[in-house]
């Protein structure tokens, strides 16, 4: 078995030295793992959006539309070229990946061998462990290669792997091969195996050949053991009960030793009896018969002793073999435990990779849908480009007469613009002149207002003075009236003296007339002053309000 394990390890190293690294498949097929694919798709989306924006961009007039078309035409052509380049790159990448997948289609594996039932499960597990120990260093692929279940079986039980007669072996049916062939291009997890599938298939074939050779050697080695070992090797437990077998052998060895000891004791007793009876020299028949009987017993015991010694040596050999097998079974138990742990971890990783494979499959389906959508979009864009080229040629034919008319209109508008510019300059000069005049008028108005304010102040002072004079005259008039009333009373008092004093009255009358004349003169002067003050006040008020002044009254004129 050690030789087989060593040879298996050497073959694994030889096969792994020729293996290629399949991890680049993941970076080329998944959108999340491929930076190149993600960048190209983003750039394609941006280019399509820019192209649609340039195509749908609107203008106010046909001339402006034509000008915009001439300006955006090179950019549109560049965008279409870039879009076509990225599409071709994606198509080539997809074609390369699908081609590699078709090349890596699985081959039919048929394992044929005889006498596989003679191999114990521990030997098979150890052999498989030696072949797979280096391979578990990287994550397992999402899809098991054909023949993987053949080596593992249902939970590692050899009863599921082989028939009892040991002549039949597991094979792959046609339906399984068809499903494998169809899953090459439809199942994304298979991409993780990639280009090293052929080397893996070759490796599996080598392992099958080595298993057959190891099986033959083990069968030849196990043929020399006792028949009691064969049912234990073939049992579903896959392990020989070596401790129980060792205990049975030890017990059998003890019994044989006890029998040997008893035989030796009997031989010693018989020899002592023979030595005691031989010197007597009895020549009678009874003594001779007893001696012959003792000799027969000695020979029988010697034969039994020889047989027992042979059996003891055989038992000791078997005991040594059993001890070696027990030690080997202990190491096989440790290997089996490690193999079971590795198998559980491998199954967990296989489940994880299966989930990842389903996610990758969904991503690939989305990518294929997106590629088909981009193909249809590209066809639509090609039709739009052809329509735009047709519209451009029609527009170029129709735009020449309109262009001449537009040039004439532009020349006429330029002349009108020059004329309007001259008029605008004249208007600006007039506006500046009017602004200067307005400033002058405002300055004169301010000066006039200041002058009028000063005159109003003077007139106000005069009015105050005249008011005082009027008050003084009013007091004088009141005094005169009081004097008149006093004189009237005196006249009444002196009525009696009228006659007597006619001269005196006449004189007084003349004086009174003179006083009255003076009074009238004073009143007339006061009225004249009042009228003059009133007229001056009205004239000032009218001057303030902006009306032309009126002439003085007739009283002032008189």
Curated annotation (Swiss-Prot):
Cystines in this chain = none
The Gene Ontology CC terms held by the record are: vacuolar membrane
Q: Which domain of life is it from?
A: Eukaryota
- Looking at the record, which segments are called Disordered? 162-183
Q: Which residues form a coiled coil?
A: 194-363, 421-527
UniProt domain NAB: residue ranges: 21-101
Q: Keywords in UniProt for this one?
A: Coiled coil, Membrane, Vacuole
Q: Where in the cell is it found?
A: Vacuole membrane
InterPro entries documented for this protein: NAB (IPR011684), NET_actin-binding_domain (IPR051861)
* Tissues where the protein occurs: Expressed in the epidermis of the root meristem and the early expansion zone.
Q: Which GO terms describe its molecular function?
A: actin binding
Query: So what does this one do?
Result: Plant-specific actin binding protein. Associates with F-actin at the tonoplast. May be part of a membrane-cytoskeletal adapter complex.
Q: To which protein family does this belong?
A: Belongs to the NET family.
Description of its domains? The NAB domain, also called NAB (NET actin-binding) domain, is sufficient for F-actin binding.
Q: Please identify the protein, giving its name as recorded.
A: Protein NETWORKED 4A
What is the organism of origin for this protein? Arabidopsis thaliana
């Amino acid at each position: 078995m050690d030789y087989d394990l060593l040879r298996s390890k050497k073959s694994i190293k030889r096969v792994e030295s020729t293996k290629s690294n399949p991890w680049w498949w993941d970076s080329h097929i998944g959108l999340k793992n491929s930076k190149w694919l993600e960048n190209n798709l983003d750039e394609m989306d941006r280019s399509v959006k820019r192209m649609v924006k340039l195509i749908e961009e609107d203008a106010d007039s046909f001339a402006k539309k034509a000008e915009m078309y001439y300006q955006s035409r090179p950019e549109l052509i560049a965008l279409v070229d870039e879009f076509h380049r990225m599409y071709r790159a994606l198509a080539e990448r997809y074609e390369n990946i699908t081609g590699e997948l078709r090349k890596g289609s699985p081959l039919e594996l048929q394992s044929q061998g005889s006498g596989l039932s003679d191999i114990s499960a521990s030997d098979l597990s150890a052999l498989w462990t030696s072949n797979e120990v280096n391979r578990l260093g990287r994550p397992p692929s999402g899809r098991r290669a054909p023949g993987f279940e053949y080596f593992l079986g249902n939970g590692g039980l050899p009863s599921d792997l082989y028939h009892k007669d040991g002549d039949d072996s597991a094979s792959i049916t046609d339906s399984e091969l068809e499903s494998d062939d169809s899953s090459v291009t439809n199942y994304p997890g298979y991409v993780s195996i990639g280009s090293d599938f052929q080397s893996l298939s070759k490796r599996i074939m080598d392992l099958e050949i080595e298993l057959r050779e190891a099986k033959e050697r083990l069968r030849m080695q196990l043929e020399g053991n006792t028949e009691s070992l064969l049912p234990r090797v073939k049992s579903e437990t896959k392990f020989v009960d070596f401790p129980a077998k060792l205990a049975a052998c030890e017990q059998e060895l003890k019994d044989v030793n006890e029998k040997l000891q008893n035989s030796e004791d009997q031989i010693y007793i018989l020899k002592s009896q023979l030595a005691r009876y031989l010197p007597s020299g009895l020549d009678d028949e009874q003594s001779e018969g007893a001696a012959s009987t003792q000799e027969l017993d000695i020979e029988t015991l010697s034969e039994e002793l020889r047989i027992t010694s042979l059996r003891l040596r055989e038992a000791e050999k078997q005991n040594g073999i059993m001890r070696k097998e027990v030690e080997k079974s202990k190491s096989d138990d440790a290997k089996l435990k490690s193999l079971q742990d590795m198998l559980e971890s491998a199954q967990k990783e296989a489940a994880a990779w299966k989930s990842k494979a389903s996610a990758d499959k969904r991503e690939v389906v989305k990518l294929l849908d997106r590629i088909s959508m981009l193909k249809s979009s590209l066809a639509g864009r090609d039709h739009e480009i052809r329509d735009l080229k047709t519209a451009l040629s029609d527009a170029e034919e129709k735009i020449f007469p309109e262009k001449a008319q537009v040039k004439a209109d532009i020349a006429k508008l330029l002349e009108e613009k020059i004329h309007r510019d001259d008029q605008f300059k004249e208007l600006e000069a007039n506006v500046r002149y009017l602004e200067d005049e307005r400033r002058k008028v405002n300055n004169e108005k301010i000066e006039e207002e200041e002058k009028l304010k000063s005159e109003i102040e003077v007139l106000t002072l005069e009015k105050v003075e005249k008011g005082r004079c009027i008050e003084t005259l009013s007091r004088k008039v009141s005094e005169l009236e009081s004097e008149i009333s006093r004189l009237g009373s005196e006249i009444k008092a002196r009525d009696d003296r009228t006659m007597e004093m006619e001269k005196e009255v006449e004189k007084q009358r003349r004086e009174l007339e003179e006083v009255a004349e003076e009074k009238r003169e004073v009143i007339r002067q006061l009225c004249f002053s009042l009228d003059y003050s009133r007229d001056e006040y009205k004239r000032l008020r009218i001057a303030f309000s902006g009306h032309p002044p009126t002439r003085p009254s007739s009283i002032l004129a008189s």
